[in-house]
Amino acid sequence: MSIISSLTNAGRGVVNTVGGAAQGINSVKSSADRNIALTKNTGSTDSIDATRSSISKGDAPSAELDGTANEENGLLRETSMLAGFEDKKEALSNQIVASKIRNSVVQF
């Protein structure tokens, strides 16, 4: 191997090293620029933060109202069931009375 080819190979190695480092720096910069652009284009988070506190303040009363609504729905179902029993009981009573009336009319 001659001195010229050795120097040429060494020069290529230096150029490749410098080129690789430059590409690495460029990749890091591109990634940082892309992340900055994404952050800028998503808008402000102030409105999200303001809404989050309002939502958390309303969560406890909302849960309490849900519990009350569940209790009321249970009472409504029970009342409807009792009303249905009363209707059936009244219908049965009416049938008994009608049957007695028929029997008493037939006996005369």
Swiss-Prot record:
Compartments (UniProt record): Secreted; Fimbrium
Inducing stimuli: Expression enhanced by contact with host cell wall. Also regulated by HrpRS and HrpL.
Sorted UniProt keywords: Fimbrium, Secreted, Virulence
Region (Disordered): 41-73
Compositional bias (Polar residues): 41-56
Keyword Transcription regulation in record: no
Highest rank taxon of the organism: Bacteria
Keyword Hydrolase among UniProt keywords: no
One Gene Ontology term, aspect cellular component: pilus
Main localization, broad class: secreted
Family, similarity comment: Belongs to the HrpA type 1 family.
Entry function: Major structural protein of the hrp pilus, which is a component of the type III secretion system (T3SS, Hrp secretion system) required for effector protein delivery, parasitism, and pathogenicity. The hrp pilus functions as a conduit for protein delivery into the host cell. Also, affects the expression of T3SS-associated genes. Required for full expression of genes that encode regulatory, secretion, and effector proteins of the T3SS. HrpA-mediated gene regulation apparently is through effect on the mRNA level of hrpR and hrpS.
Annotated protein name in UniProt: Hrp pili protein HrpA
